[in-house]
């Protein structure tokens, strides 16, 4: 209901919602590990089986097995490793309410807004400094909410922003470049894969690499979207 309310208030169309899945697939198309790689169109999405209105099958995350791991250590210790280290520039976390039914408004995520603001403040950077973005996408609306609640676009603008190709390969803000939960994988604890893709991008070793990524913003979500965590990664050592 929250998504339908958002669409009514902002004028976001079903075609724009479907564009999220189309954009993710353009990224996963060149990712060998991705579960779904064949390119799709908006019509393909809208003609796929309805799961729960307004979400069609291709607007819902995959169900897969999988796992991942990261090594977290000091910057000094990381210099001893064979691979170039990636640094955590900023962090943030927020829980709006313990029960999703108690959210003040389901047409946006207060937790997204709070956690991302904390991360930007800690990192000391602006939105224009971010080269790459990962937003948890269990369903197609979450990248739309994320773009707005993180402050990359204004409320009601995210659908058109994605539809116009701005988050797709060659766009001004590459997003969910592995294919995300809609096309790459979704094991239930998908946040691990968000972080891994951010790290691979800033290292320059991603399967579908974005040129010259120096800063990646990674946004996770929990409890529908009443809870959130934000991380900002960089390949340059933070100033002490």
Residue ranges and their predicted role:
Residues 6-12, 116-129, 206:
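Phosphate/pyrophosphate-binding loops at sites that engage ATP/ADP/AMP, CoA/4′-phosphopantetheine
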Residues 1-54:
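Glycine-rich, mobile lid/loop segments that gate access to catalytic sites or pores
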Residues 19, 50-114, 164-178, 182, ...:
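Condensing-enzyme catalytic core mediating Claisen C-C bond formation in acyl metabolism
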Residues 134-181:
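Active-site pocket-lining segment
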Residues 21, 25-35, 96-100, 140-145, ...:
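Acyl-CoA/ACP chain-elongation machinery
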Residues 2-3, 109-123, 197-202:
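Short, well-ordered amphipathic alpha-helical segments that serve as non-catalytic structural scaffolds
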Residues 15-16, 126-131, 155:
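Short acidic capping loops at alpha-helix termini that bridge into adjacent secondary structure
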């Amino acid at each position: 209901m929250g998504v339908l309310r958002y669409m009514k208030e902002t004028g976001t169309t079903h075609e724009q919602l479907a564009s999220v899945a189309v954009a993710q697939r353009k990224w996963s198309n060149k990712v060998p590990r991705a579960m779904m790689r064949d390119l799709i169109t908006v019509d393909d999405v809208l003609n796929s089986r309805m799961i729960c209105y307004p979400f069609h099958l291709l607007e819902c995350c995959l169900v897969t097995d999988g796992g991942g791991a990261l090594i977290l250590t000091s910057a000094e210790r990381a210099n001893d490793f064979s691979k170039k280290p990636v640094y955590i520039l900023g962090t943030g976390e927020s829980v709006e309410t313990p029960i999703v039914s108690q959210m003040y408004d389901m047409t946006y995520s207060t937790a997204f807004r709070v956690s991302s603001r904390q991360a930007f403040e800690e990192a000391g950077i602006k939105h224009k400094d971010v080269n790459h973005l990962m937003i948890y996408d269990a369903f197609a609306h979450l990248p739309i909410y994320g773009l707005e609640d993180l402050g990359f676009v204004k409320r009601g603008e995210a659908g058109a922003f994605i539809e116009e190709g701005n988050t797709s390969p060659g766009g001004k803000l590459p997003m969910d470049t592995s294919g995300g939960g809609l096309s790459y994988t979704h094991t239930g604890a998908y946040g691990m894969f968000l972080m891994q893709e951010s790290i691979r991008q800033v290292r320059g070793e991603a399967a579908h690499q974005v040129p010259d990524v120096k800063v990646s913003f990674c946004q996770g979500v929990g409890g529908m979207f009443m809870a959130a965590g934000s991380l900002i990664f960089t390949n340059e050592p933070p100033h002490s």
